[in-house]
């Protein structure tokens, strides 16, 4: 007998394989995992038949296990499918313990609007260009919701802008250095989703000790905070703070501390002669805050 139900839904131009693998990595123990395959070709056509298929599977599964709590993970369009399903089934809301969106264009896909600017019905573009922010905000009042977005630059994951993924009432996490498909393979995304599904309360990180450690590095010089866009994620703290780097063996190596609201709290750099000192400081932080970090160890 499973302890809970975890539905996972793939998105546009995809099948269920990768999100099923992700679900296996992040699911709570003894969870029953359901990852319907909607078919690659069908994801290019209309969203309503896809919603109907997933709704049928969910209805049957929830009826079979009427007392089990329910969680959902949806990647991109998969998250939109579940926003529609849950909006139509408020009787399921009391059973929902977590709804995780991975790069879902809740406010509408800008590429879809470009492909179908008049809303004439050009394939799936019409359906993905619609804003579902109002529906998502109503759901967020009834259940815990997490929106994880990738960021290759400060605008988004090369497919979905950051501003399209956020809405009132959600927990908003941006994972730097991850593009749209990479949300399904990132160990840091896995860790954030696993932490949320387990309903753990993140402990806040006082940034001052971290900043003091970085400032104490030999040769550290104040840098340009705007440069953190496109930097590599090194450490992700459970409260959303992230330590990012731009590393170079021949010029300057930059380090940034960014908070959960995407504000850069520290920016600095060292020259090649002090590069080793910087990486030793990062290793020290990794050890000191090991119990507050999400994601893989090197």
Where are these regions (language model features)?
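Serine-dependent carboxylesterase/thioesterase catalytic core
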Residues: 6-12, 16-17, 21, 26-27, ...
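A short, charged/proline- and glycine-enriched loop
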Residues: 1-5
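C-terminal catalytic-base region of ester-bond hydrolases, centering on the histidine
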Residues: 140-298
